[in-house]
Amino acid sequence: MALLQISEPGQSTAPHQHRLAVGIDLGTTNSLVATVRSGLSTVLLDEAGKALLPSVVHYAANGQVEVGYAAQRQQSHDPQNTIASAKRFLGRGLNDIGDTSHLPYQFVDVPGMVQIETRAGIKSPVEISAEILKSLKARAEQALGGELTGAVITVPAYFDDAQRQATKDAARIAGINVLRLLNEPTAAAIAYGLDNASEGIYVVYDLGGGTFDVSILRLTKGVFEVLSTNGDSALGGDDFDRRIFHWILEQTHLQAPNPADTRLLMTASKEAKEWLTEHTSANIAVTLSNGKTVDLSLSRTEFHSLTQPLLNRTLVPIRKALRDASLTVKEVKGIVLVGGATRMPQVQQAVADFFGQAPLTNLDPDQVVALGAAIQANILAGNRHDDELLLLDVIPLSLGLETMGGLVEKIIPRNSTLPIARAQDFTTFKDGQTAMSIHVLQGEREMVADCRSLGRFELRGIPPMAAGAARIRVTFQVDADGLLSVSAQEQTSGAHANIVVKPSYGLSEEQITNMLQASFTAAEADKHARALQEARVDAARLLEALEAALRQDGDKLLNDEERTEITRQMEHLRNIAQHEDSDAINKAVDALNHATETFAARRMDASVKQALAGQSLNTLDI
């Protein structure tokens, strides 16, 4: 009789079997895939020996889908059907994208995520990104000789729920099991921390093709803690290309070039940028579709001057991230550069000037994110003990819910470490209330009108009882990928409801930055507004309770003079509550409470007498 192999619950039946897992850097300009071999993280190469896969997808006339270099070669000839930098559009609406005049695509403005019209039909950024992921998966499985267990895919630190979910959806379409989404700066920290055994405060300066992220990290004995993050999701190496592109238009007096010429000039701009990394001048020679020739020379000094405003833009998020972490420049031990754009000399010089020290460039800035993701994937696949490395990401904006008076009660504050779960108890406002609307919000302001709505759901089945008697526990959970779920449960009946927040499309980096800035600017005004609304809510609650008490017991327990005085004080509170003075409202509430103390005592006595009526000492449960 054959023996049945068993194992402890939760353990593999083959605990020492190496599982094939990879780290994927799904980049705006280029994408990579890496894995851990013999304890070392290495990037997997294609058949031509190249590590980078251009994040470009071409929909050919014969129905074939080309990805990478093959697609890139079609950009000049067929720009409308060759989609580059689709990552910029993940989880975004057309209004979020901003200036599209330089893009040759036919955008379809539909509710939710923007779509792009191609000869293969209307394609979403999710579908386009899935083609890139399919290509990386095929490369990995061919190189590793087997089927992947899963992958860790990196995303910019400031990707919100919609953008992260869109990334997961793209992976699902590509047939990839996502072990985890990992912030790109955190992935870089993993790679550098393990290679160099670094400890202390580090800044990860990540300037990719389309996004800029900065993270402040504390590295201590294998623990990577993200203290704060900031950035700009509409700033990257592509913007440096566009500065050269617009410079060419100015020099040649070209106006509104057609899509093919736009692609030719953008390609020439990118090549000039890369040439200037190693040389002091670059020649730009392009023959346009009308036969006209562009022949210009751009010096490194001119290029630095053109792009100085872009460099200055990267310093603003750095200052904000340092302030959020309560750190100064002097406390930073090192700066890690990530992203191909950081090869530009003016970028390295700007970073060195700001921090007063040269940045670290030990690892290839194009590969470092994928290398770190591969290390994390190896751990999550069970190939290493997960106690060897602990990383802690943070959420960029506070999460909370609406309370009476349009106020926001923050449940999870911004920069909280992920994953995280927080619970808080709430109660009903009215007598006999059997349902409660839960409104989930994101932002730093005190009033609902100034924050972003993430979703709503209703909790029904609350047992009818006096206002304030019910206990509803609301739990916020944010997983390691930054996705939020909210649940509410009434403690006595067990009534339960929940929501998983997947917004139709997300916030841009600029909007997030503006929300944070507005919270700082309006802090004092928000404080007064909250105090006023809290006072008004207290007043309304007291007035409603007194009206019910007077209807029930006023005639029995009060004489005419007492009732008139209470009514006068109630009317005074109603009038004061219409004004903008929270102190005056609180004083009126205190005065009304004082005026009704005798009435409250009589009601309590009457309730006790009623409860004891017909009872003897022997029948009481004492």
UniProtKB/Swiss-Prot annotation:
GO biological process per UniProt: iron-sulfur cluster assembly
Organism domain of life: Bacteria
Presence of keyword Manganese: no
Keyword Chaperone among UniProt keywords: yes
UniProt entry keywords in alphabetical sequence: ATP-binding, Chaperone, Nucleotide-binding
An example molecular function term from Gene Ontology annotations: unfolded protein binding
Gene3D superfamilies found in the cross-reference section: 1.20.1270.10, 3.30.420.40, Actin, Chain A, domain 4, Substrate Binding Domain Of DNAk, Chain A, domain 1
Similarity comment: Belongs to the heat shock protein 70 family.
NCBIfam families cross-referenced by the UniProt entry: HscA (TIGR01991), PRK05183.1 (NF003520)
HAMAP family given in the database record: HscA
Purpose of the protein: Chaperone involved in the maturation of iron-sulfur cluster-containing proteins. Has a low intrinsic ATPase activity which is markedly stimulated by HscB.
Name used for this protein in its record: Chaperone protein HscA homolog
Natural source organism: Methylobacillus flagellatus (strain ATCC 51484 / DSM 6875 / VKM B-1610 / KT)
Lineage summary: Bacteria, Pseudomonadati, Pseudomonadota, Betaproteobacteria, Nitrosomonadales
Gene: hscA
